[in-house]
């Protein structure tokens, strides 16, 4: 089955699933007589009726994000397996792969640098270096293609940026930066592994030169899986990359909903202009804040073909802390006076949909107990949101585990069942992250352990 047939089948299944889900939710059928009050105000009282309707409308804050995910999943083929180079690698622009680390896991960094360098050579890449930016020296072996940059403890940015933003800004200082304005930087996390497809996609993006910033898909199920629960939960993020991320970059060339902090490709001149020096509010989710400022400055973004590989958090505690930091960082970004509402409106809707998740989750219990009169368009939109989010777990598993079930439908069925079983866990963790994130300290940067040898 070729990629075009797979994509057509996926689109047909997605549409059928949305319609069937709406049908089984009773959207297209009349309720049993007497089961729904004709006047909610008379039955529940004015205040409780208003609360019930507000809860229903709150559930639609995520609708713009869902529509973008639908557009991305249906308009663009996610099943092409090979990225073709458009020009000879020898003629490609100079690329710096930059890894930022605290220096707590030196062996992990060294091993991944070696692995990624081999992948670069396998892809035929010539004009590149790896740059490791660390708070503590990790003493990398001498190599003309590897540069270790230790951030001095006394270094301070003009605005007081901290954590990863501080380290990234240090690299851009005149007396530290060795790159030319037209060179490119690929930002990686400690555990990020390149693939030949990702390298080909990056080279095509850089060679094209139409956009200053780009990003691609990251999957989490390659290699040995440490925690199946967190890995299956992260399958949603894979579908989110192939849906919303791809849609916003391919159609609008803007980070309408922000972007991730890894597999980030930037042109040096543009990155130095935007900078990471945005104070504490730009230090928790420095990637998201950076994207909003870049959009404000008028820079354009594009989607990069080819995937990279990372690991999901190894423990549930790390998983919770990771989500908490994202929520707090996006909250600081959305509430920053440095970014105009026109640039952060969709990101704000996405944030508030997440922040009100504990309330919207209650509807699972409240809807049967306090039914409201039917409104076909409204009810269909609610079922659409639920159907699409469920499908994204399934689609994410299909893409993430394709190398593991290639010759076994039974394995695929097991992975899909596992993903569906993790949904309650994911909802619980996301709700906990909201509660901890909204009421906890917002000046901390939790480091997730991705070194498998320490587990």
UniProtKB/Swiss-Prot annotation:
Pathway membership: Protein modification; protein glycosylation
Pfam families xref list: Glyco_trans_2_3 (PF13632)
GO function term, MF aspect, one: beta-1,4-mannosyltransferase activity
InterPro entries: B_mannosylTrfase_Bre-3/Egh, Glyco_trans_2-like, Nucleotide-diphossugar_trans
GO CC terms: cytoplasm; membrane
Tissue-specific expression: Endothelial cells.
Subcellular location: Cytoplasm
SUPFAM superfamilies: Nucleotide-diphospho-sugar transferases (SSF53448)
BP terms from Gene Ontology: carbohydrate biosynthetic process; glycosphingolipid biosynthetic process; protein glycosylation; response to toxic substance
Gene deletion effect: Worms exhibit resistance to the Cry5B toxin produced by Bacillus thuringiensis. This is thought to be due to mutants having reduced population of glycolipids which are targeted by the Cry5B protein. Mutants also have reduced brood sizes at only 17% of wild-type N2.
Entry EC no(s): 2.4.1.-
Keywords annotated in UniProt: Cytoplasm, Glycosyltransferase, Insecticide resistance, Transferase
Enzyme class: transferase
PANTHER family in alphabetical order: BETA-1,4-MANNOSYLTRANSFERASE EGH
Family, as annotated: Belongs to the glycosyltransferase 2 family.
Function: Glycosyltransferase with a proposed role in glycosphingolipid biosynthesis. Involved in susceptibility to pore-forming crystal toxins in conjunction with bre-1, bre-2, bre-4 and bre-5. Involved in resistance to the nematotoxic C.cinerea galectin Cgl2. Has a role in determining brood size.
Designated name of the protein: Beta-1,4-mannosyltransferase bre-3
């Amino acid at each position: 089955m070729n990629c075009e047939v797979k994509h057509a089948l996926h689109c047909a299944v997605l549409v059928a699933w949305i319609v069937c889900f709406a049908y089984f939710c009773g959207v297209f059928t009349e309720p049993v007589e007497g089961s729904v009050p004709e006047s909610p105000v008379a039955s529940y009282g004015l205040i409780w009726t208003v609360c019930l309707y507000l809860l229903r409308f709150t559930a639609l804050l995520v609708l713009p994000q869902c529509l973008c995910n639908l557009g991305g999943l249906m308009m663009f083929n996610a099943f092409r397996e090979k990225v073709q180079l458009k020009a000879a690698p020898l003629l490609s622009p100079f690329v710096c792969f930059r890894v930022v680390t605290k220096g707590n896991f030196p062996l992990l960094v060294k091993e991944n640098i070696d692995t990624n360098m081999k992948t670069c050579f396998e892809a035929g890449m010539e004009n590149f270096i790896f740059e490791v930016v660390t708070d503590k020296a990790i003493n990398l072996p001498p190599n003309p293609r590897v540069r270790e940059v230790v951030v001095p403890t006394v270094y301070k940015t003009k605005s007081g940026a901290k954590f990863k933003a501080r380290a990234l800004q240090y690299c851009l200082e005149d007396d530290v930066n060795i790159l030319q304005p037209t060179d490119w930087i690929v930002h990686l996390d400690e555990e990020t592994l390149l693939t030949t497809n990702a390298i080909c996609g990056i080279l095509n993006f850089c060679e094209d030169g139409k956009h200053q910033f780009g990003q691609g898909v990251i999957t989490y199920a390659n290699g040995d899986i440490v925690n199946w629960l967190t890995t299956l939960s992260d399958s949603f993020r894979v579908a989110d990359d192939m849906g919303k991320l791809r849609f916003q970059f391919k159609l609008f060339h803007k980070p309408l909903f922000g972007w991730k902090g890894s597999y980030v490709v930037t042109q040096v001149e543009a990155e130095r202009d935007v900078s990471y020096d945005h104070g504490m509010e730009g230090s928790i989710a420095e990637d998201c804040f950076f994207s909003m400022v870049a959009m404000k400055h008028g820079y354009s973004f594009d989607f990069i073909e080819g995937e990279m590989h990372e690991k999901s958090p190894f423990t549930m505690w790390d998983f919770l802390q990771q989500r908490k930091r994202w929520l707090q960082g996006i909250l600081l970004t959305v509430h920053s006076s440095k970014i105009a509402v026109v640039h952060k409106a969709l990101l704000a809707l996405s944030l508030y949909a997440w922040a009100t998740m504990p309330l919207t989750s209650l509807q699972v219990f409240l809807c049967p107990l306090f039914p409201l009169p039917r409104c076909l368009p409204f009810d269909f939109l609610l079922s659409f949101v639920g159907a699409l989010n469920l499908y994204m777990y399934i689609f994410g598993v299909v893409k993430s585990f394709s190398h593991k079930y290639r010759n076994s439908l039974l394995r695929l069925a097991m992975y899909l069942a596992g993903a569906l079983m993790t949904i309650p866990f994911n909802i619980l963790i996301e709700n906990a992250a909201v509660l901890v994130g909204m009421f906890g300290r917002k000046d901390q940067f939790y480091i997730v352990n991705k070194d498998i040898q320490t587990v």
